[in-house]
Regions:
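Alpha-helical transmembrane bundle of multi-pass membrane proteins
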Residues: 1-188
Length: 188
């Protein structure tokens, strides 16, 4: 989970920074990728109760691999609309994957370790993002090659996620409620 979190976070940050290297109008590209980000987060929020984390991350990982690979193929002669679509779809899948990962994180860890695991994942993501501005300053295809490699790594790790069944989730919720009621009973 830590590797997936770090790779998605650093991939998102890299895609944000390397928008200026894609051969298209920067303002227009930034506007469309921001719109795609908002749509991705809304879709993730709507589908979150119905989608499993493993399948969703694999789907978004495959989409981000394909779209970031297509961004690598862009040249100065590429049409603006094609470049905008490729970069926006790459960001869409990264935003979708990160939103699902954030919302479903609690389903993968026991209640007592949830805060610790979120903190460790955020620390690792922050450490990896320290190096991403250096990557994004390279010439056009190289930041997107690194982005594609990051997307491939987290998609490969997503295949190994073991989800809890509905029964296990309800048992965890029941245990958390019992311990909460015991704590409030002892406080009074």
């Amino acid at each position: 989970m830590f590797i997936i979190w770090v790779m998605i976070g650093s991939g998102y940050y890299t895609s944000s920074l390397c928008l200026k290297n894609v051969p298209v109008d920067f303002e227009k590209n930034g506007l469309y990728t921001s719109i795609f980000d908002i749509v991705a987060i809304l879709v993730a929020g709507c589908l979150s109760p119905y989608a499993g984390i493993r399948k969703t991350l694999i789907f978004s990982g495959m989409g981000s691999i394909v779209s970031s690979s297509l961004v690598i193929s862009l040249t100065e002669e590429s049409s603006d609309s094609l470049a905008i679509f490729y970069t926006s779809s790459s960001r869409f899948f990264l935003s979708y994957g990160f939103a699902i990962l954030y919302m479903k994180h609690a389903a993968l860890f026991p209640t007592f370790f949830l805060g610790t695991s979120l903190g460790m994942c955020h620390f690792g993501k922050g450490f990896a993002m320290f190096f991403m501005p250096m990557v994004a300053e390279a010439e056009h295809p190289w930041p997107n090659i690194v982005l594609t490699i990051c997307n491939t790594i987290w998609t490969a790790f997503a295949f190994f996620i073991i989800e809890k069944s509905a029964k296990e989730l309800s048992e965890d919720e029941k245990y958390a409620q019992e311990s909460h009621s015991q704590d409030s009973h002892q406080a009074s």
